[in-house]
Amino acid sequence: MVAGLERISDGTISIGDRVVNDVPPKDRDIAMVFQNYALYPHMTVEKNLGFGLRRRHTPREDVRQRVDEMSEMLGLRDLLRRRPGQLSGGQRQRVAMGRALVREPEVFLLDEPLSNLDAKLRVQMRSELKRLHDRIGVTTIYVTHDQVEAITLGERIAVLSQGVLQQVGPPQDVYDHPANVFVAGFIGSPPMNLLKGNAASGRISVGEVELVDRQVPDGEVLVGIRPEGLHPVGEAFDGPVFEVSVEVVEPLGDEVLVHGSIEARAALGGREAEEAALLADGKRDRATITLRLPPEERPKPGSRLRVGMAQHKVRLFDAANGLAVQPR
């Protein structure tokens, strides 16, 4: 719709100060990069970079200058005489990016541009994309199923599910204050822990453990807490405590993920509220939970942990519709 390949059913799309609802795609000044590189295999890198400019009858000297600048910016100067078949995946991706950027468009559309790359190259290209965006300052819409890419690259992110906008905002705000349980489960790896709880007279509880005081409507709620919001505590700790049975420990070098269970009614593990009953089947008296701990803290599977909760990081959701519950 932004590119003009599909018509919108209502509202307006503006690029800068110009409404482009009825502007043909070729006149919208938009450049696109897709999951597949779509390079011309018979052309050199240099000719691929300058193809769009030549099609627009840009003066030859301007084409040469802009191709030189872009190849320098993307580290392609030594590859200008090569053809796409002689390049690595990361190099081809940079050529595809450069071919779009060299036009100096008003809007840059990226549709999963890193999904064909291996894990190491994706991390490298992610930092290059961030650096490139900071340098050129072009408005960029980046489509991805990878929430890490969304959080690290975006200044604002929009979370969609089945074509419906769930939440839009700065990455940290979406992470800290998800609008519903779908966002809570999608943004963050591991996802937010969701425990079935109860609100009564301003007090929130999970099973027999009383948590924060929040002035919210009475009834069933889902208590959300990120893995880093949980921490082992000693006997002297006077706040709410869960007894966690450690089941799986994942040492990741700079951190340790601990997966376990607590005695409570149910857990959602980042899924939508209506799935609670299904997930509780066969485990009705226990709830799954994940902690993120520093590397020096590595409990053994089968052990038990006393776990406290950072109360200011607790988020509440309506158990019926999954929407975030705001204090009255």
Where on the chain are the PLM-derived regions?
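C-terminal boundary and immediately downstream tail of ABC-type ATPase nucleotide-binding domains
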Residues: H177-A199, G224
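ATP-binding/catalytic-site motifs of ATP-hydrolyzing domains
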Residues: T12-S14, R18-V19, V164
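Short flexible coil/turn linkers enriched for glycine and charged/polar residues
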Residues: R81, G188-N193, P217, L252-D254
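Non-catalytic connector elements of ABC transporters
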Residues: G202-R328
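ABC ATPase nucleotide-binding domains
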Residues: R7, V23-F182
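Helix-to-loop junction immediately C-terminal to a conserved catalytic motif
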Residues: A3
